[in-house]
Design a protein with these regions (language model features):
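Short alpha-helical segments that sit at the start of domains
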Residues: 1-34
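Hydrophobic alpha-helical segments that drive targeting, anchoring, or assembly
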Residues: 20-21, 46-47, 76
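Amphipathic alpha-helical segments within well-ordered protein domains
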Residues: 26-29, 44, 48
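Short acidic, hydrophobic short linear motifs in intrinsically disordered regions
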Residues: 34-47
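Short amphipathic alpha-helical interaction segments
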Residues: 50-61
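A short, conserved structural fragment
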Residues: 64-73
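Short, cationic-aromatic polyanion-contact patches
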Residues: 74-84
Length: 84
């Protein structure tokens, strides 16, 4: 399913349907280490590697989906799939 939206490990387009978008966001969220705080510039750099075209929307979707949280320019992972 994700192959339709990715090429060579990068996002080429975001799914329109929220359910598909959540699957893609879950994969992206795994780029962030649980328990670590990231400056906004770090988050932007990581997300640009995934989707250079519109990393700002990608960041907003991660927050809206409850996978990242933010405060005062800092972000941390709060959701998505975690490996035990």
């Amino acid at each position: 399913m994700l192959r339709a939206f990715t090429r060579e490990g990068r996002i080429v387009s975001l799914p329109a349907r929220w359910s598909k978008k959540l699957l893609l966001l879950d994969v992206v969220a795994q780029s962030f280490e649980p328990g670590r705080a990231y400056a906004e510039t770090e988050v932007n750099a990581i997300l640009r590697e995934w989707y250079e075209h519109d990393w700002v929307s990608l960041r907003r979707y991660l927050v809206d989906a409850g996978m990242l949280d933010r405060r005062d320019g800092w972000y941390w992972r709060i959701g998505g799939t975690f490996e035990l």
